[in-house]
Amino acid sequence: MARYTGATCRLCRREGMKLFLKGDRCFTDKCAFVRRSYAPGQHGASKKKMSNYGIQLREKQKARRIYGILEGQFRTYYEKAEHMKGITGENLLKLLEMRLDNVVYRLGYGASRNEARQLVTHGHFLVNGKKVDICSYHVSMNDVITVCEKSRSSEKFKTFVENPKTLPKWLEANVDNYEGKVVAEPSREDIDVPVNETLIVELYSK
């Protein structure tokens, strides 16, 4: 599966805000954005007025980077969102939230979506009792996500039990059983990503 392999901190600097792509490090003074909050490159520190297209493009890039998705896959999600009932932009964010790697992150198993993606790829999770190692797997309401029995002795998952995360309303966790459950579809209020999805819709509608 294709993925971005460059410097993660450059992505935050390019978008002009913390995207929290490196988990706990983003909350420390080691965060590159704290030291250099301007865009990377020779002219990164200079201020330039952006066109409407540029603003829309940056919003789309920001969303892609938050969820760790390449352009082709992101457009596929958008096209699917267009054909769903409801508001296209909100549908897009809901589809992204219901990816297995994002649900694993929301449940608190990974400090970042990137870490959650690695945990899924390495086969640490079951969905409804069956192993799933595909990050883009779309979870549905009432799906149960469980840590594999053999993975539970890992310090990573022990931390989950000892320090459970506050969950969004659409998820529940049974910490003692190393499992989480999707109890509803996320509403727009439940999705705390700093993205204006209307700008993304405007971009793709051109």
Curated annotation (Swiss-Prot):
All copies of domain S4 RNA-binding, residue ranges: 98-163
GO molecular function, one term: rRNA binding
Keyword list, A-Z: Ribonucleoprotein, Ribosomal protein, RNA-binding, rRNA-binding
Assembly mode: Part of the 30S ribosomal subunit. Contacts protein S5. The interaction surface between S4 and S5 is involved in control of translational fidelity.
Protein name (record): Small ribosomal subunit protein uS4
UniProt record similarity statement: Belongs to the universal ribosomal protein uS4 family.
Function: One of the primary rRNA binding proteins, it binds directly to 16S rRNA where it nucleates assembly of the body of the 30S subunit.
A single Gene Ontology CC term: small ribosomal subunit
Keyword Transcription included in the entry's annotation: no
Source organism of this protein record: Clostridium botulinum (strain Eklund 17B / Type B)
Position of the signal peptide: none
Pfam families attached to this UniProt entry: Ribosomal_S4 (PF00163), S4 (PF01479)
InterPro entries assigned: Ribosomal_uS4, Ribosomal_uS4_bac-type, Ribosomal_uS4_CS, Ribosomal_uS4_N, S4_RNA-bd, S4_RNA-bd_sf
SMART domains, sorted: Ribosomal_S4, S4
Gene Ontology BP, a term: ribosomal small subunit biogenesis
